[in-house]
């Protein structure tokens, strides 16, 4: 086993958070090596690489790059496309963090003989009875615990999280006070890195260029081999009885719970309740019709079974920065997690993630099946 020394491998994106993380780790006495992953380069821009290299040079730390574009394409982008094409609503950032980014950091650190791994995530870590847990960040507006439900102890015990105890405002001030003005004023990244604005435009572009995705996800497992036409055909909006309401642009361009952007005008508010890929139909209904009191999860991870299973005071979140609900979680005979909600939730969509908390500790999560 590697010695738990003061060496740390830090994921550096070139942005404010990971840059300030590097400064804070250095000031805490760590020997920092920065690694910048090449996951996806929007519009072929490599400015982030130069920013990370320049910062590392100013700080006097070693910096390397790691080309992960091919694995990112197969495990994240093709999964993302696959999920929309089967009528689901994926959350690619949870997959990237749990099954790609943090495991890659761990792998590279092992190869370099480094024990600790770190990022600029706004989360904290605590140890309770020899078990490590992710817990809420000091900055509730930036808290990113929701995305890390799949991490296991081999990763958790190595994590350093230098941004968890400060706010984003404090992070910007921290950089400015040390003469890193460019770092201090960098804009926050928004949305999914490979389609930060509109996923529909990305899907259209992708399907034209890559109309037969070969899905290859390590975890969670998905079925592969579907062949889709580069043309997504228009289909029918229907009510819960199956009666025609209007035409839509193609089922992948809608998500459960959606109200805006339907392109129709009715005398009542309607929401997407269900997506039927095999019929190219999108079912519309009232908001109340979208309420559910239970759900099933696959590909789940539990940090501590005794703390999570069977308790009535578990908090579940199914969206980043969205409402919380109390629930009771059990494991079914066919190895799904059954989540019994204490109050109804609306717009629970297959493919989304759910994360569980108790006493501020992230206890695990999974992917919603239904």
Curated annotation (Swiss-Prot):
The keyword Ribosomal protein does not apply. The lineage of its organism: Bacteria, Pseudomonadati, Bacteroidota, Bacteroidia, Bacteroidales. It is an enzyme of class 2 (transferase). It is found in: Cytoplasm. It comes from the Bacteria. The gene is mnmA2. HAMAP family: tRNA_thiouridyl_MnmA. Gene3D superfamilies: Adenine nucleotide alpha hydrolases-like domains (2.30.30.280), HUPs (3.40.50.620), Translation factors (2.40.30.10). Disulfide bonds join 96-193. One of its GO terms (molecular function) is ATP binding. GO terms for biological process: tRNA wobble position uridine thiolation. Catalyzes the 2-thiolation of uridine at the wobble position (U34) of tRNA, leading to the formation of s(2)U34. It catalyses: S-sulfanyl-L-cysteinyl-[protein] + uridine(34) in tRNA + AH2 + ATP = 2-thiouridine(34) in tRNA + L-cysteinyl-[protein] + A + AMP + diphosphate + H(+). ATP binds at residues 11-18, 37, 120. SUPFAM superfamilies: Adenine nucleotide alpha hydrolases-like. The keyword Disulfide bond applies. This is tRNA-specific 2-thiouridylase MnmA 2. The record marks 121, 352 as: Interaction with tRNA. The active site is at 96 (nucleophile), 193 (cysteine persulfide intermediate). It comes from Bacteroides thetaiotaomicron (strain ATCC 29148 / DSM 2079 / JCM 5827 / CCUG 10774 / NCTC 10582 / VPI-5482 / E50). Belongs to the MnmA/TRMU family. One of its GO terms (cellular component) is cytoplasm. Residues 142-144, 319-320 are annotated as: Interaction with tRNA. Its EC number is 2.8.1.13. Keywords: ATP-binding, Cytoplasm, Disulfide bond, Nucleotide-binding, RNA-binding, Transferase, tRNA processing, tRNA-binding.
């Amino acid at each position: 086993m590697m010695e738990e020394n003061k060496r740390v491998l830090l994921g550096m994106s070139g942005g404010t958070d990971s840059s300030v993380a590097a400064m804070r780790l250095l000031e805490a006495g760590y020997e920092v090596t920065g690694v910048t992953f090449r996951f996806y380069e929007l519009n072929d821009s490599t400015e982030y690489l130069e920013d990370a290299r320049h910062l590392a040079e100013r700080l006097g730390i070693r910096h390397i790059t790691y080309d992960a574009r091919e694995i990112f394409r197969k495990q994240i982008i093709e999964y993302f496309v696959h999920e929309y094409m089967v009528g689901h609503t994926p959350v690619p950032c949870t997959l990237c963090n749990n099954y790609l980014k943090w495991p890659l950091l761990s792998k590279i650190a092992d190869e370099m003989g480094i024990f600790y791994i770190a990022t600029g995530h706004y989360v904290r870590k605590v140890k309770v009875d020899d078990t490590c847990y992710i817990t809420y960040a000091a900055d509730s507006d930036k808290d990113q615990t929701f995305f890390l439900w799949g991490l296991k102890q081999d990763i958790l015990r190595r994590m350093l999280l230098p941004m968890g105890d400060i706010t984003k405002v404090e992070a910007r001030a921290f950089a400015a006070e040390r003469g890193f003005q460019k770092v201090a004023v960098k804009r926050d990244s928004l949305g999914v890195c490979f389609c930060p604005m509109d996923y529909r435009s990305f899907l259209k572009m992708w399907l034209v260029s890559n109309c037969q995705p070969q899905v290859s996800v390590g975890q969670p497992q998905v079925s592969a081999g579907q062949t889709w036409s580069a043309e997504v055909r228009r289909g029918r909006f229907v009510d819960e009885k199956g009666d025609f309401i209007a035409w839509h642009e193609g089922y992948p361009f809608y998500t459960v719970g959606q109200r805006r952007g339907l392109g129709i005008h009715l005398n009542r508010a309607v929401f997407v309740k269900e997506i039927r890929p095999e019929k190219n139909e999108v079912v519309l209904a009232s908001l109340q019709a979208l309420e559910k009191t239970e759900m099933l999860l696959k590909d789940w991870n539990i940090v501590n079974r005794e703390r999570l299973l069977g308790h009535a005071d578990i908090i579940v979140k199914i969206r980043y920065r969205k409402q919380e609900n109390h629930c009771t979680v059990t494991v079914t005979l066919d190895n799904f997690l059954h989540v019994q909600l204490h109050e109804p939730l609306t717009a629970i969509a297959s493919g989304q993630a759910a994360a569980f908390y108790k006493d501020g500790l992230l206890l695990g999560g999974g992917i919603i099946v239904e």
